[in-house]
Every structure is written in C-alpha cells, then in structure tokens.
C-alpha cells in the first residue's frame, strides 16, 4: 500500500522573523471549521495523512511543518528551540487569519508541536476555539515522582538523535530502516514509506537525500524538553483543551504515557489515552484518534 497526498487547494508561505519560511498547505472543505495540523520532532506533517485524511470532507485542514522540517528549507543559524517555535506559531496563526480570513479554529498538535502549542498558549496568548494535544513530551517539575523517568527518556532520545544517520542514497533506504525498527512496528501499512518521503529532501549537492531536520536540531529539542518548566493546569489555558496520550499501561510504552496521564489527572484536563499505542498514536491507530478528535470537537460545537 502506498499513500498519495492530494494536491492542496491553496498554498502560501509564512515569513518568520529570521528569514525562515513555513509552507502552508490547505486541504479539505474551505467552508468548514479550520484545523491546523502538524507534527512531532524530526517528523513531518504529510506523514500524518493516515490520520488527517479523515478530516478532509468536513474541515478546512491546514497542514504545515515547523521550521527545519518537512517541506520547509532549513535555515542557518537554525534558531531551533522552543521559544522560537512558539513565536513561529504565532506568525502562522496571524498570517493564516490575514490571508484566509477569520474562522473558528481548533489546533491539532503532536509531541514537539503540542509542547510548542502549550508554551504559545500560556506565554503568548490563546488563539483557538479549542486545542488538541497528542502525547506532548510533558516533563513534570523536579521532585515529581515521574520526573526522573522523563529525564531518562529525553536524554536517551537526545543521544540517539545525535548519532542518527542523515544522508540516504534513496527514499527506499530510509523506508527499510524504519521497517527494521521495533519502535515503528505498530505503524499502519504504507506509513514507513510515507514517513521516509515526508522527512527527506534532495541533498543540495545533488547526491541522494538527507533529513530535512538535521540530527543536531532534533537532538536539541529533545534536550530542551527538560528545561521548559511547563506543567500547567487545564484552567490556565484560555479555552477547551483535550489531552490525548499514548497507552500508559502498554509494555515498553514511552515515559510520555504515564507523564500525560499524571498531568491529565493533576491538571484537571479532558484526558484520554489510546490503548495499545506508543508515541506516534495518530499513525498507529488513526481511526481511534479520529474518533476522539470528532468527539471533542463535537462537544464544543466545532464538528
């Protein structure tokens, strides 16, 4: 099986404060509730198509990648840190409203982008009618019983990313690498090839392909997860927030599962988890994630 991303009805670029640009792709129903959809660290939004394709018939879906990811041209210096990502998100929000007009909007974010959306909403401002957070790498404050588990988790990811291979002769090479990994064993059929296509770009020197998100940029974000001091209550946001974690009880589940369950309970969130999933739940069990998405949006008059 091979996924084919439909051509967007509209594209536009959002210029960022340092000259970087984010390429926005509009899909679906332009008259529907607007749903910006994006990705986690080192990944790319097109790879989440098994999830967001189910939204196209009803919603105005805006697909985009954060700086130095996906369809965006990497910049030097990279300015690849959470404070910058939050400011970038504000630019995306404001430019989208300016170009496409105001519209009821629910942001859908995963992992790094979910953490960015939390920081943006708490520190810059609430810009949504609702916010959906899929398995953000929520690190409790020091002294919390789960802090150490998240510290170990993020440090392991940081070291892994630093040693990650960055160049490939073909898309197939990375596809096979994904297929050989235990961590990707639950991805839906066709996802390994889709992910490889989404995260690679042609090497500027014309020799094969390279990761759009350089390993050092990916590693920096994992390391910064431990520095944010961001463990907010749901009441600190300016509107409804849905927190959806991976399975906290799953054998071998990442530390994000128990951490998000703890935040959900302690912070008074509308919290759910998707049974039998790891961190990439939207591409492991997209149908269940869509069910939770539509349920939450409907609850707040957005579906």
Name these PLM-found stretches.
Residues 109-113, 117:
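Gly/Ala-rich beta-loop-alpha elbow adjacent to hydrolase catalytic centers
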Residues 23-74:
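Conserved HGGG/HGGXW glycine-rich cap/lid loop of the alpha/beta-hydrolase fold
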Residues 274-286:
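Catalytic histidine-centered segment of alpha/beta-hydrolase-like enzymes
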Residues 17, 66-108, 291:
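Active-site loop/oxyanion-hole signature of alpha/beta-hydrolase fold enzymes
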Residues 122, 129-170:
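Flexible "cap/lid" loop of the alpha/beta hydrolase fold
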Residues 165-251:
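Alpha/beta-hydrolase
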Residues 235-277:
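Conserved loop-alpha-helix segment in the C-terminal half of the alpha/beta-hydrolase fold
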